[in-house]
Amino acid sequence: MVNVEAIRKVQRAEGPATIMAIGTSTPPNAVDQSEYPDYYYFGSPTASTRPSSRRSFKRMCEKSMIKKRYMYLTETYWKRIQMFVPTWLLPLKARQDMVVVEVPKLGKEVQPKAIKGMGQPKSKINPLVFCTTSGVDMPGADYQLTKVFGLPPSVKRLMMYQQGCFAGGTVLRLAKDLAENNKGARVLVVCSEITAVTFRGPSDTHLDSLVGQALFGDGAAALIVGADPVPGVENPMFELVSAGQTILPDSDGAIDGHLREVGLTFHLLKVVPGLISKNIEKSLVEAFEPLGISDWNSLFWIAHPGGPAILDPGGDQTRPEARESCGNQACFSVSMATCQVFVCSSFSTRCEGSPKEEGLKTTGEGIEWGVLFGFGPGLTVETVVLHSLPTH
């Protein structure tokens, strides 16, 4: 007689899911944030806005902590479009024609980096999780990536469109379940974002759009997530201990995105930083109370910054190091679902050995336990508990 429980036991991994490798990539086109308002954004002959709007946008760029933004849209391409139609009115078809092709292409660039870090051939990859806020299509970017990267046609795929800035946590939550419930699985997670679907010129009637234009750039990131690493071959960076998602109370309409003929439009309320500050400790308590941890200053933090106000609303709930870790990505523009992965990658890079950080004993910059946060439409919060591993 077949024993279902015995079958399930064989199918499941023995240990926790781990982040085994990370790869990141950005488009070659880079723009200094200090030059972006005058020379790139307001340089269009169709951009006639009030001086107050210009000053507001410059102030947003200055406070963003971003030093350089990477963009698929080059200045030449952007100005050529502006000769015919303001970017506020650029039709969805034109945006889709760009991102449907370029999102999988940018995603393809990061896969070899992640697979090299895993130390296993790409034939070990299964399943594939692809996430993007940039465009929608059928078959999706997961299908296109499978074809261009030469993955087996039998690879299990999951496509996530239109999730927003919390999705960096979502993909880890899903990858954790996939890795722990499928023995031997090596989950390839790819996030690829190109802001052509949201990019538009200034408008005096849509001032909340300026926030997204000031913050978001383009980039792609890939992770390999798996359990029971092969000794001497795979060297995991973090263990994924737990993962949760919640919708914050009284947050309806705080962050919205709507796909319209003019592309993906953003609507942000000023109360977002306050809502997160007010509720973030509850998420921390729920995640860390089972571990006996209540000192948030003892954790390393990885979060989607979404602008400095998100993690520094004037409160005591977040530690200075949280803002510092997020700043590693903010220096190179914020990229929706990929942001948290970029920060994870920067942790790994620093632990590998610049003189300043020599001697760090864990992948969490010497700290054992950490938290990864994602904030986005809903207002939705993803919380992932990370356990760092020895660097040697």
Swiss-Prot record:
Superkingdom classification of source: Eukaryota
Q: Which GO terms describe its biological process?
A: flavonoid biosynthetic process; polyketide biosynthetic process
Look up the record and name the pathway of this protein.
Answer: Secondary metabolite biosynthesis; flavonoid biosynthesis
State what protein this is by name. Answer: Chalcone synthase
Main EC class the enzyme belongs to: transferase
What's its EC?
2.3.1.74
Keyword terms, alphabetized: Acyltransferase, Flavonoid biosynthesis, Transferase
